[in-house]
Amino acid sequence: MTVAEKLAELGIELPQVPAPAGAYVPALVDGDHVYTSGQLPFVSGELVNPGVLDDSVTVEEGYDAAKLCAINALAAIKSVVGDLERVKQVVKVVGFVASAPGFDQQPRVINGASELLGEVFGERGQHARSAVGVSALPLGTSVEVEVTVRI
């Protein structure tokens, strides 16, 4: 099954990549790797589940936000490589989670991104990962995810 077929089976339609809000690009090809900028959980221009984990956002809502970040990362990758079939391996995922003091469930939140990538790419979706708690993220988002792939 192709990546496009798998996305369709999962009911996922990749969004248009929004124009950057600053002096950066959404994704960059360097040799045989693609690096995404931090992706936020936007759907149709609206930030989903903003706030802080263990305060105004639940682990489940954070998980869903991380999944949306991964979908947006796939859209950014596709925008620079043309076809997600070119992805040979998801190499690394870095997830940032806006966290209340004492919150330690960042890995469960970032599983939303990791599990989606595994579903979409199968074995090629296995990756190294960091899940980091921070006090605040841009625009008040609860989660931000970066993805690196090899093409």
Predicted regions and their residues:
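Short, polar/acidic, helix-capping and beta-turn segments at strand->helix junctions
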Residues: 1-151
